[in-house]
Amino acid sequence: MKRKEPLAGKEEFDKKVAHIDRAPTIDLGSHGTAHLLCGEKFMLSFVDMPANSYAEPHRHKDIEQGTIILKGDADFVVEGKLYPVHEGDVLIFGPNEEHGAYVGPNGAKVLDVFSPHREDLLEKLHKATSPTE
């Protein structure tokens, strides 16, 4: 099908399109590493979770989270109950809902979506992208 719209210029393209591998990386400690991208009211965190790792149960006050399992598998613990999840599964966590995970032997890649932004991750992002003095 023929396109009638003009092609976006490089500057326009760069404002709208990002590649995960070129997004800034932050260290999440035992949770792995993450590439972060932010919209005005949401945050995308592409997380590489190491094999056989454990993400301690935690909560995000006033923040909703969606977690999409892109690759691998894990057993998520939500409010004290175990939820085995696999590639293609999506978890939804309400504000202040406790969650953690036991990652499988092959590790996992997940996409966490936060709304609003997590200030702690924004701070790590700022440190990771700021020039050292």
Which sequence ranges carry the predicted segments?
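Short acidic-glycine-tyrosine-enriched beta hairpin
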Residues: G80-P95
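Glycine- and acidic-residue-biased ligand/ion/polar-headgroup-sensing regions
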Residues: D62-A74, E79
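A short, N-terminal "cap"/entry segment at the start of jelly-roll beta-barrel domains
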Residues: M1-K41, L125-E133
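A short glycine-rich, His/Asp/Glu-containing loop-to-beta-strand
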Residues: I20-P57, I63, D112-V113
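Conserved GNAT-family N-acetyltransferase fold
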Residues: V47, T67, L91
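Tight coil/turn sites that cap or link beta-strands
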Residues: A51-N52, G88, N96, N106
